[in-house]
């Protein structure tokens, strides 16, 4: 039975989703959960792209102990050097080098001839091989590349020392039949491929990312790249949970096994959904809210008699626990910490103390603290602990003619308090106009979403906002509170803080 490696790029390609901006602490939390999930390789980022990305890759490389960590690099020596520096503390570092091979990319983006592309591949793969034992090469836009030239580029990379060849369907163009044939062609034409690991990286523009990844595995790929929940730019990437469960359920067909701990998928999905601000569609395969719901009377009757009648995946297989008992104000520290571990959170001793204190405050306000409340509690603690600005006071009042007014006081990281007031056509607009005055910013609110974390009158509100700055960059913010207006203010303030922080970093890079 063949062994399939899982390569997770949630922290790199997944973060290219508009409005998704993970900070260092969030990325480490996600990486630790991916490690529990059994991911073989974590792509932590693109080290040379920014000082922030470099620090994230470096921190993840130091934190992860049981799987490989890799960084992305172009065919540029400086990129490779920067990746080596970022990954020096990794227990099993790898590097992922890419260069486009399609005619449209070579002509309009790279402005390089085929000969120049081949020479660059040869030089930079050889250069990287001197620094890394595992070198992965990706011919970007492979599925739209001339087949003969693609094979020549792959052979060049292997001859120069590449140990992994990843075939990206960069724009989600291919289909399972074509993609499977491509892997057959590579295995037939490439010389000395026995020790080479072939991989797939599929996008979902035509809705076939998972099917294409499985077609690659069926035709010789031994590594699959993707993200949790399928997040990524445009229509997203291959959803790793779908591939892993498909390989498990249809082991009779694929004859493949993995290192994936399937019952960690629910925790992984929940964590990434909340930190990214991207809700999982209820009809999403494997981990959607409706995945194990049965509306039809005939289906319900069948499932009650024998679940196998309509369920090929049991909820427990992917970590969906329908019988999880809520915690209450009498629950102790041990029970709380145990539940945190079961939910996939790795907290330091101080973080455990802070979280338990917040839990007790929450338990005093709610009869039952559910798993959803606990996710929100940790998310709120994580986001507030590194916010550059903290909401200290909010007052909303009716003015005249339907106009609302808001007074907002915030505390900056250095402890300074600033306060201002503004009006708006409603309470939310008044609050956001006031924050804009305080932050001296002119931004566009592109998305506002509110949801109750649990049912009942004592439910907390979770508000997600997305804002866009002058450069068109989007930033996501989360706010959680029993009061909707306070949660809304927290979310907008967090997104604004991220925008300010990125602006300062950009100014630094410009000066540098």
Curated annotation (Swiss-Prot):
This is 2-isopropylmalate synthase. Keywords: Amino-acid biosynthesis, Branched-chain amino acid biosynthesis, Cytoplasm, Leucine biosynthesis, Manganese, Metal-binding, Transferase. HAMAP family: LeuA_type1. Its EC number is 2.3.3.13. It is found in: Cytoplasm. PANTHER family: 2-ISOPROPYLMALATE SYNTHASE 1, CHLOROPLASTIC-RELATED (PTHR10277:SF9), HOMOCITRATE SYNTHASE-RELATED (PTHR10277). One of its GO terms (cellular component) is cytoplasm. It holds the Pfam family HMGL-like. NCBIfam families: leuA_bact (TIGR00973), PRK00915.1-3 (NF002086), PRK00915.1-5 (NF002088). Residues 390-512 are annotated as: Regulatory domain. The keyword Amino-acid biosynthesis applies. Catalyzes the condensation of the acetyl group of acetyl-CoA with 3-methyl-2-oxobutanoate (2-ketoisovalerate) to form 3-carboxy-3-hydroxy-4-methylpentanoate (2-isopropylmalate). The keyword Manganese applies. It catalyses: 3-methyl-2-oxobutanoate + acetyl-CoA + H2O = (2S)-2-isopropylmalate + CoA + H(+). GO terms for biological process: L-leucine biosynthetic process. Its cofactor is Mn(2+). One of its GO terms (molecular function) is acetyl-CoA C-acetyltransferase activity. Residues 4-266 form the Pyruvate carboxyltransferase domain. It comes from the Bacteria. It is an enzyme of class 2 (transferase). Its main location: cytoplasm. Belongs to the alpha-IPM synthase/homocitrate synthase family. LeuA type 1 subfamily. Pathway: Amino-acid biosynthesis; L-leucine biosynthesis; L-leucine from 3-methyl-2-oxobutanoate: step 1/4. Mn(2+) binds at residues 13, 201, 203, 237.
């Amino acid at each position: 039975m063949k062994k399939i490696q899982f390569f997770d790029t949630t922290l790199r390609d997944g973060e290219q989703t508009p409005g998704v901006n993970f900070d260092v602490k969030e990325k480490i939390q996600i990486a630790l959960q991916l490690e529990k999930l059994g991911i073989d390789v974590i792509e932590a980022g693109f080290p040379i792209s920014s000082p922030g990305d470099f620090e994230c890759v470096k921190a993840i490389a130091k934190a992860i102990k049981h799987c490989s960590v890799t960084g992305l690099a172009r065919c540029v020596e400086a990129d490779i050097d920067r990746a080596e520096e970022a990954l020096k503390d990794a227990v099993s570092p790898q590097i992922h080098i890419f260069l486009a091979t399609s005619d449209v990319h070579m002509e309009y983006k790279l402005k390089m001839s085929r000969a120049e592309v081949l020479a660059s591949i040869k030089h930079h793969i050889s250069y990287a091989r001197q620094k890394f034992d595992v070198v992965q090469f990706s011919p970007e836009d492979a599925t739209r590349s001339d087949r003969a030239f693609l094979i020549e580029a792959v052979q060049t990379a292997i001859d120069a020392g590449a140990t992994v060849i990843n075939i990206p369907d960069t724009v989600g163009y291919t289909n399972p039949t074509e993609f499977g044939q491509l892997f057959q062609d590579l295995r037939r034409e490439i010389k000395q491929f026995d020790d080479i690991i072939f991989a797939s990286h599929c996008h979902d523009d035509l809705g076939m990312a998972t099917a294409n990844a499985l077609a690659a595995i069926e035709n010789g790929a031994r590594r699959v790249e993707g993200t949790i929940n399928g997040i990524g730019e445009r229509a997203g990437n291959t959803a790793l949970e779908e591939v892993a469960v498909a390989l498990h359920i249809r082991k009779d067909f694929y004859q493949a096994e993995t290192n994936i701990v399937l019952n960690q998928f629910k925790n992984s999905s929940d964590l990434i959904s909340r930190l990214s601000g991207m809700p999982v569609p209820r009809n999403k395969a494997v981990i959607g809210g409706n995945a194990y719901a049965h509306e039809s009377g005939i289906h319900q009757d069948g499932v009650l008699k024998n679940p196998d009648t309509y369920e090929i995946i049991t909820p427990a297989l992917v970590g969906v626990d329908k019988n999880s008992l809520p915690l209450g104000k009498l629950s102790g520290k041990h029970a709380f910490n145990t539940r945190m571990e079961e939910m996939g959170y790795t907290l330091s001793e101080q973080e455990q103390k802070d979280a338990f204190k917040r839990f007790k405050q929450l338990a005093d306000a709610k009869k039952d603290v559910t798993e959803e409340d606990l996710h929100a509690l940790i998310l709120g603690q994580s986001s507030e602990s590194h916010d550059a600005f903290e909401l200290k006071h909010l007052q909303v009042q009716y003015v005249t003619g339907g106009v609302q007014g808001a007074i907002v006081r915030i505390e900056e990281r250095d402890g300074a308090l600033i306060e201002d007031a503004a009006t708006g056509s409603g309470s939310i607009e008044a609050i956001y106009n006031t924050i804009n005055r305080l932050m001296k910013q002119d931004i566009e609110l592109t998305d506002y979403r509110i949801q109750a974390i649990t049912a009942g009158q004592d439910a907390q509100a979770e508000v997600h906002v997305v804002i866009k700055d002058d450069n068109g960059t989007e930033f996501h913010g989360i706010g959680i509170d029993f009061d909707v207006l306070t949660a809304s203010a927290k979310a907008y303030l967090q997104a604004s803080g991220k925008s300010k922080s990125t602006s300062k970093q950009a100014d630094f890079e410009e000066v540098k």
